[in-house]
Amino acid sequence: MTAARLGALDPTVFELAARRVMARCDELARITSTPGAITRVHLSPEHARVNRLAAEWMREAGLQTRQDAAGNQLGLLPAADPEAPVLMLGSHLDTVVDAGRYDGIVGVLMAIEVVRLLQRRDDDTSGVDAPARSPFDFGLEVAAFSDEEGARFGKALLGSSAVAGTWDDAWWELEDPDGTTLREAALEFGLDPGRVSEAARRPSELVGYLEAHIEQGPELHARGEPLAVVSSIASARRFQLVVEGEARHAGGTPYDMRRDALLGASEAALAVERICSTQHHIIGTVGQFEAFPGAMNIVPGEARFSLDLRGEFDGERDRVWDQISRELDDIMGRRRLRWHTREVHNAPALFCAPLLQDVVGEGIRSTLVPGSAVDGSILGSGRPEDPTTLFSPAGHDGMAIGAITDVGMLFMRNPDGVSHHPDEAVSLGDVALGIRALAEAVAHLGAEHRRT
Ligand code: HGY
Ligand code: MN
Ligand code: MN
């Protein structure tokens, strides 16, 4: 399927595909460990159920499916040459706690629709349905990664790190809030920890990785645009911090005798906000916060909190971490407290490959064709010829996959940028445009690949 032939398709083809994607997002949203909310963490029974459902949808779209040794669900549309490398398209099916229904999920389902649209069935005189094939000199493989969020064990990108061959066996000892180790969870899920390296792919096997994702920020909504090219993905470091003071009687302990761990940690959280909010593309968030022993009439002797620190450039992010650390030394020294920390996640910034940024831009341009309107997302209505390009403060699987191949990303508008929240949304029209843009991007890459 060439870009020209895609362009000849009736826009309703993309709308029908988008309707299927939205309906399936709703169906997957019902697979949750917390009825009434959406929570689907790594190696849970819910993870197994969505992998089975995604595999069914992949097979129905003509793909050959398998679950890899790390629990990722894959669907392959081979090229005519079975030894040819593949372009990987996908996202993740795991969620944060009390999540929205599109973060990750919509990208996996859009990838299935794009591969369905692009596939070719060789004319077969025997009348038997010939197997679907990629029309390019590379195969197309849909990846439904697991554990992009790190919601269960704290370390994110576990599924895509296994594919990238950057797995660290120390992760097997990571524990979830119930004390279950990653190793125990993998065994219970039916995986063999000793074979996780079988999930790893060699650079020579891939021509690249493309991911469609909601923006998880307010930019596109504010600009009134449906789609954007992603230039780079923020680097991330995640820490668990402990502040130690002294538990004392809430009534009998005068203030000058207190070593209140909660107040020390509270000052630290405010310092994170003050330091990060004055820097460009540096984002620090304290998302978890607990005080111990946690009684109303006891001065907290210990406080535990998390820090999620991101930056456009690793060096700047690390400089800010040093600044925060110095500030914590001051705060805890003044309050006669002690603090220590454990880093649980560290992923470098990912700069999207220029070629993949270009083909995603071509894909977006293809949606500018007047008349390719879908449910009111009227196109060609004075939107800039040059597609918007955005930095992604949100993390994505491309941060891991970038270790072995080029990465490109397409953003779709999500109203007000609400994400990691049940109100997360994306419109049918923008998903239809996103499917068209992603398919066109692949077709442009196919043409480019033939030329090289
Ligand atoms: O945390 C993130 O930025 C991503 O949603 N995992
Ligand atoms: Mn997320
Ligand atoms: Mn995501």
Task: List the model feature ranges, each with a label.
Residues S33-P78:
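A non-catalytic alpha/beta surface segment that caps or lines the substrate-entry region
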Residues T39-L43, T285-G294, S306-F313, R338-D358:
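A short beta-alpha structural unit
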Residues L89, D98-E148, R237-V243, H249-I275, ...:
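Alpha-helical metal-binding/catalytic segments enriched in His/Glu/Asp
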Residues E15-A18, A29-R30, T181-S231, A269-R274, ...:
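Active-site-adjacent substrate-binding region
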Residues P135, D147-E148, R152-D314:
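Midchain, well-structured core segments that form catalytic/ion-binding scaffolds
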Residues T2-S44, W171, E343:
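N-terminal capping segment at the start of a domain
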Residues V21-R24, A29, L87-S91, G376, ...:
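Zn-dependent metallopeptidase/amidohydrolase metal-coordination segment
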Residues S231-I233, H249, T253-T278, R326, ...:
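His/Asp/Glu-rich mid-to-C-terminal helical/loop segments that flank catalytic regions of hydrolases
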